[in-house]
């Protein structure tokens, strides 16, 4: 289990104060969901309680990506390489990442590509932790992502849009524990 706390202010009305508040309430690992482009942001996220940060490979040149990856690791944080194409996944692997998140939402148009994870995940080594971001709204979606190799999913939209957040969360968590879920085998 992991909590992804949205701290990006402009599109999601999140803040580091929100993450600090969540950090006080739970002991689960937390990822600071923001667009990280500067080492200062990594230090800031760590100070506010983040255990991990996302690095969006598609908007960073290779040198910047690797420098931010090194900075996160030097602070004892996990860096999640967020990719949208097989080429971005290759760049992340060349840098030596251990966690790759395939984001099904396009960065520029905010369109959903429901096949992104199924297209990219098979090319990732088995030792890499694979996360599916976006497109998981139902227990069936979760099981489909797991059958394509997902070790974890981010289902924020489904949970936050639900009339009953607790029920939606329980439904997805139960699906992840179901014997039919390939990750449970």
Positions of PLM-derived features:
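Catalytic core of soluble alpha/beta enzymes
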Residues: 84-129, 135-145, 162-163
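C-terminal helical cap(s) of enzyme catalytic domains, especially alpha/beta-barrels
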Residues: 114, 119-123, 146, 160-185
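N-terminal active-site wall of soluble small-molecule enzyme domains
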Residues: 1-80, 88-91, 99, 117-120
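Structured helix-beta-strand junction loops
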Residues: 75, 126-127, 149
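Residues at alpha-helix caps and immediate loop-helix transition turns in enzyme cores, especially N-
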Residues: 14-18, 64, 112-116, 141, ...
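Catalytic cores of alpha/beta
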Residues: 30, 37-49, 84-96, 132-155, ...
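Glycine-rich phosphate-binding active-site loops on the catalytic face of alpha/beta enzymes
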Residues: 7, 44-64, 101-111, 148-169
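Secondary-structure boundary/capping positions in well-ordered alpha/beta enzyme cores
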Residues: 29, 127-128, 179
